[in-house]
């Protein structure tokens, strides 16, 4: 049975090993779109947008997927002492990486919006599955963790409904694999790690992963612009509201 690839919204699913591959891919994307509709930052009807527009002190109901993502995000925020923080959204809004001639925001605007950043401004109610902000102006953005969650849930769907298949799910830096690669004796899948600032498809390293494993890569080269000979990238430091200065151009986690 041959394989098929489908690309939607920068998400790629390649699958094979079963006759109804199109149904497999379509079903996996349905799982993704359901999650996306809830965690979208831009869809006014999403769970995230409803929370973002809610006033302080008023609990906002979370759907099961959004609750799980927020719960895990807060765990990571605490473990990293705030280096990862989903409340970075008010500062993110100041940074424009899409315009033809982007410029960094004024420092006074960053400072003004930093007062809304801090995961301690969130109260997650595990019993009622609600999220409450303690001050007005707090917003969350699940873009830093939602993609990986959606990728994992899509893989679980494939595993449950098409156990004899194989699949590669590439969701913009989040790569999960399932099953046995028919082109490899050991069944592994080879994933290339993009060379920072090089042409797309130029890899710094090739890594083999097996069924159920994943590799996630993020880097300063993915969304960035130069201004006055300085590189400004999209990975913001919640403590400063400016691009992080870790010294790394790319980090991958297996």
Name each region found by the language model.
Residues 3-254:
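Mature catalytic core of soluble alpha/beta enzymes
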